[in-house]
Each structure stands twice: as C-alpha cells, then as structure tokens.
C-alpha cells in the first residue's frame, strides 16, 4: 500500500531530516498538519500504534529540525510514539508495513536505520542508554549531542530515576524531554509559561546563572538566596523541583503542540552544559477526536475507517485468555476478600478493567514497576493476603531477582498470572514470551502450569491460588478454543493427562499447542499427552511413555533451551532411560514480528510443521 504523496506537498519535501532542515520555519506548522494526516491515513489502512504518534508530531519535527541527526543521538523511550520519526527518516513509503512480517519494526531498531540509535520496546531504558552515549560523546570530543524522549508513565520507573541520579552526579551534557500527556494543556502552559521557558533556556540566563554562582561561591548565604529566588521564580509556573534535586536544569512545561516554541526552546537548550530536562505537555491522540477522547482504546489499533470514528469489533466469539483470567479474578474476589490483584500498568491488556471497578480496594496498579510489583506482592503474602500478580511474560523478565529472592526463597503464596506466553505477534522481538518457562523452571519452590485451553486455564488459576507457595499459570495472547468451562476444582499438582493412545511415538505437549499436536498425533498415530505441569514434572507419566514408545517428542511455545522439553531430557538421563527425544519449540533466535499463526507456520509449530519435524527426524 502506498499513498499519493502529492496530497502532502510539504511532507513530500522532507523525505529525510536533511531535507527537513532546509525548509523555512514558517512551513513547519503545515508540515506537522500533513504528517499527522499521513500517519492517520497509513495506520487506519494497515493497523499499528496510533495515539502516541499523533501526540508527538510537533516534537518530532522540532527535534529533527534543530538537531543534526543522525550525528546527534535521538533516543525514543519504548518507541510506541516513533512512527512520525520513522516517516521523517527515509521510511515514509514503507510505514504501512510496520508490525508486519518482513516489514518495518514496530519500534526504533538499530538494524533498520542509522537514525534509530537504540533498539527499544520495553519502557524506561532511554535515559540510562542516553547517559552512556553522552559519556562516550564527551570522550569522542566531536560535539555530538544526546536527546532522550520519555513519557510521563515511563519516567516513573525506578530505572529512569537511577539514570537521572547518575546523570546529575557526573554532570554529563544531555537533554531529557519529558513528554507529559497525562492531562490536556492547561492555562499555565500558555504565553507566559512558554515565554519563561525560552527565557530560562536562553544563553543570557544560563550565563548569568553560572556566573552568579561562581561570583558568590565564597558567600554561601547569598548563593543560597539566589538559588531560592530562582526556584521561587520557577515555582510560580512549573511543577516541583524534583528534577533540580536530581541535578537537572529543569525547563518547562511548554506546549508540545506549538512547533515554533519547541524549535526555539530546543535551539536555546542545545548548547547548555550538564543534564537538562525539558517538560512538554502534549495530548495523546492529538488531531483525531476519537483518539483524544479515548487514548487508551486507540493506543494500538486494527485497520479502521477514520470517518466512522470507531474501531471494528473482534470477529471472534471466543473469549481471550486475558478475559478468562479477568472473569476468574472477579469470581474469586466475590468469595474471598483476601485476594489482592497487582499489575504493573497493564490493566487493560491483562483483562482487569472490570475487576478494578468492582473491587477497587483489592486492586493495585503499581505503574511501570515490575520489580516493585513482585516484592509488594511478597509483602502482601507475608501480611496474610492472597496476592495475584498479573504480568506479561516479557515484563516478568524485569523482576527476575525479586521472583527468586523475595518470593521463591521465602516460599510465599503468590500467584503469577503470566499473560502473552509464547509468540505475541506484531510487537516482535522485544515482546515475545519466549523465555519464561526456561527462567522459572530452575527456581526451587515454583509450581509452573501451562494450560491447553481456557477451561484448564481457569482450573490452574484456581489451583495456583490455593497452593501454599509460589505458582505460575502461563497462557498466550489470543482467543481460547471454545472449551466448556467446568466448575472450579483443584488439579493434582504435577500430574498430566493422557489424551490419545497411539504407537511408537509419544508427543508430550506443554500448553496451548495441544490442538496442533492433536492433529499431528492423529496423522502419525502417535500417543498424545497434555502435560499440564512444567514443574513439578509428571515423572511417572514421562517414564511410562518412555517405556511404551520408541521415541518421545516434546512440544512447547517457549525457547527449546532450558524449557519444558529440557526437563524431560534431564529426567530421562537421570533415570538412565536411553530413549530418543525430539524437542520442538522456539529456536535459539529472537523471533521477529508477524501474525501469530504466520510465525507458528514459519517456525514449524502448527500441526503441519509439528508433523513435518517429526517425520524429518525419524527419516
């Protein structure tokens, strides 16, 4: 799909930042309007992250206009908002391929463009990496500048504050731009405040500020008075001095949709020494009313009709696993006031909207703070409550030490509802849930369950909730199979279920690839086992299958290395059972973006692929 660039005459003149910087500044508002419309048209036809990009159009234009990218380093935190950046950096004609197999990466990606200096996807990494680049630039001595753009959500994470504290300590030259879209632009982000921001960022003010400090350095009372006067001046129109306490020179807030103010302020700040923080106010979804009204709903969108102002409904009548979890959570909370649900800023994605409204006293959104979420849950468990941590597989990686040190070592009854296990689709390498079975399986005291359908998911959540120790239920992104939901009951810990009896080959399946494995088993006349538990492994059943069959095949949507299949291998070797084993799962690579079924087919994890791998191995 390609758009008629003739409809965007100013944008047509700026295929890359070099061309953008040749435009007269008077044309920048027109460029922003066209860029926003181009983004709207492209995403509506191809799907993708939407509201965040609309909110940073003016900022993106201003940054590339003022800074000499790619020589100067521009870093986008997380990267949801980077579509305008990609459009302006030579990828305009390919933006409609974003998040698709073999298309543009969903986030800034070093291998895709020299303008993407940091590969991202997870939040709050930009300032740490940016500080490292700033230190390297100082050693290089060529005047290279470093700019990090981070949102008001991502900056709350501990890693961001750790980086700012370090930056303030070593006083490296860098600019952090806080993109604050939590509220609409208010009156105090108007003329006076924009004027003050330009004044405070100007060279004359900076010179007087530093000169005054030096002149009165021997007179502490006067120096303190000057500092208090400066803070009082800022305090009339800006937020707290938190960033100043961390060692940053704070400027703002300014209107993030006034491209002229942004360019002038950035020009003023470009040559300032030491760590700088520019606070801008933006509106997520800017320029498209439905997205402005519901930025969360329009965060990532399927194809839609811009004229309708609505998103298409899901075509599937089957519930998602996230919905199954959310319904179970509400059902359990209705009977048990000790349940406490914890999420690190993933309420919508984890299916917890209804729970948060109906049980607000039992719901904790701890923001983007996975480490805190896990240890907070440990504290709740020590206090006699029953915490349930709802977290994506890829984000649990960020709290690995807390999982071991604060939960497992103390054998605390914390249930982890791990969403997005396995292939997630369009978000690619940074979001695949490829490693959780591997990194949890080696932790003592953990019970790890992998349901084959939505009914088993409910039963496992119930079982894990009532287990007196740490437990994890790991389920995928997407819809269930249509399984009948049975009354909740405890499953026997560490016991699998024989689903089909065959000959010679026994397929041991962990998780929701069971339906695909079933088809392969029927075609091969193989035995099929729903293993259910990754840990503790059903050793008795595995050894029985080894005794009755010529070969074993393990199937899982997790990295083969260290995964559930590795557990089977370890058991057989420990018991001196010399049975050939084929491990089928995710290969030793970071799986790129693509539709889930598309990538399963490519990786040999659909029914045909499983059968093909087995037949090739036996040939």
Curated annotation (Swiss-Prot):
It holds the Pfam family Transket_pyr. Binds 1 Mg(2+) ion per subunit. Binds 1 thiamine pyrophosphate per subunit. Keywords: Isoprene biosynthesis, Magnesium, Metal-binding, Thiamine biosynthesis, Thiamine pyrophosphate, Transferase. NCBIfam families: dxs (TIGR00204), PRK05444.2-2 (NF003933). GO terms for molecular function: 1-deoxy-D-xylulose-5-phosphate synthase activity; magnesium ion binding; thiamine pyrophosphate binding. Its cofactor is Mg(2+); thiamine diphosphate. It comes from Yersinia pseudotuberculosis serotype IB (strain PB1/+). Its EC number is 2.2.1.7. Catalyzes the acyloin condensation reaction between C atoms 2 and 3 of pyruvate and glyceraldehyde 3-phosphate to yield 1-deoxy-D-xylulose-5-phosphate (DXP). Homodimer. It comes from the Bacteria. Mg(2+) binds at residues 152, 181. This is 1-deoxy-D-xylulose-5-phosphate synthase.
